[in-house]
């Protein structure tokens, strides 16, 4: 599948990247373009190859073939301090104090002691964990520990940030707080964010672009709004009062009736497919001669819908090819 090109400069470019572990192909010719200062969703079922791709970008492993460019240069270990990484498998040293451990990680990233302490205290206050600086890590709740690890991932102001399931385990209030910070990092600091998640509501809210990987291959790629529009494919939701048979007869040969649900009192909710050659205004003129249209709007398509359809189609194609 071709990579979607974007007019914005690229933060990350993968070209035909492959990775094999024994007989298992983790990535099979994956190409991606991640625009600068964007939130790019990396999606896929468990075992699809997302973690392998993330580990490559984080510098933990390398591809067997293909290339990875980081802000226009070949990705090397020299770029490690320009990347922030929040792994799905969290881990803090339980026998250290919270502030001591945060300082340790900040210093590893090359920050001076003075700057690290100032930046950390600002973040601790922002995420409302400032009262925990001198507490033991073992005293932290799961949510508190996740906040600390988020801070550690972003403290050195990386220009590229990898977030693997960053909202997992948060209550709704703190999940909203972290989402707000992710958006702020993009908008105020120009941070490019690679977001790996199964939470499609977060994808809807946060992501500018997404790529979907399944069985080690990219099966979907593009701006979120365009993928939703493509998945909608001219479908509209319509509610009317009248005779369903008369309504169906009034559709003509162009429109397609996908589903119909009778609600009682002669009211029906239907999903229709209209080709681009039939404007919705023209269509409504046809049907209003037969029924009373109560509401009509383009069908709402979420990224959850897009994800499920793409994975289903990909799996069906794989079965056909096997």
What residues fall within each predicted segment?
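Non-catalytic surface loops within mature trypsin-like serine protease
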Residues: 36, 131, 242, 274-276, ...
């Amino acid at each position: 599948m071709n990579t979607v090109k974007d007019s914005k400069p690229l933060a990350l470019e993968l070209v035909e990247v492959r990775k094999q572990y024994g007989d298992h192909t983790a990535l099979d010719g994956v190409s991606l373009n991640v625009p600068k200062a964007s939130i790019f969703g990396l999606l896929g079922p468990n075992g699809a190859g997302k973690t392998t791709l993330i580990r490559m970008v984080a510098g933990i492993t390398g591809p067997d073939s293909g290339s990875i460019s980081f802000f226009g240069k070949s990705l090397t270990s020299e770029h490690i301090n320009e990347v922030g990484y929040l792994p799905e498998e969290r881990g803090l040293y339980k026998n250290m104090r919270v502030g001591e451990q945060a300082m340790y990680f900040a210093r590893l990233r090359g920050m001076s002691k003075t700057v690290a302490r100032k930046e950390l205290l600002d973040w601790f206050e922002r995420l409302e964990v400032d009262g925990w600086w001198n507490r033991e890590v073992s005293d932290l709740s799961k949510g508190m520990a996740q906040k600390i690890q988020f801070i550690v991932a972003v403290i050195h102001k990386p220009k590229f940030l990898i977030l693997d399931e960053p909202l997992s385990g948060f209550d709704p209030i703190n999940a909203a707080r972290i989402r707000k910070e992710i958006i702020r990092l993009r908008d105020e600091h120009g941070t490019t964010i690679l977001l790996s998640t199964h939470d499609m509501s977060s994808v809807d809210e946060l992501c500018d672009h997404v790529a979907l990987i399944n069985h080690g291959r990219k099966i979907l790629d593009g701006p979120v709004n365009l993928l939703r529009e493509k998945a909608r494919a001219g479908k509209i939701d319509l509610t009317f009062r009248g005779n369903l048979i008369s309504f169906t007869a009034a559709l003509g040969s162009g429109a397609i009736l996908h589903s119909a649900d009778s609600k009682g009192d002669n009211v029906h909710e239907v999903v229709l497919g209209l080709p681009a050659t039939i404007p919705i205004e023209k269509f409504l003129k046809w049907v209003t001669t037969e029924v009373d249209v109560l509401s009509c709007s383009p069908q709402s398509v979420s990224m959850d819908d897009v994800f499920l359809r793409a994975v289903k189609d990909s799996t069906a194609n794989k079965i056909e090819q096997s």
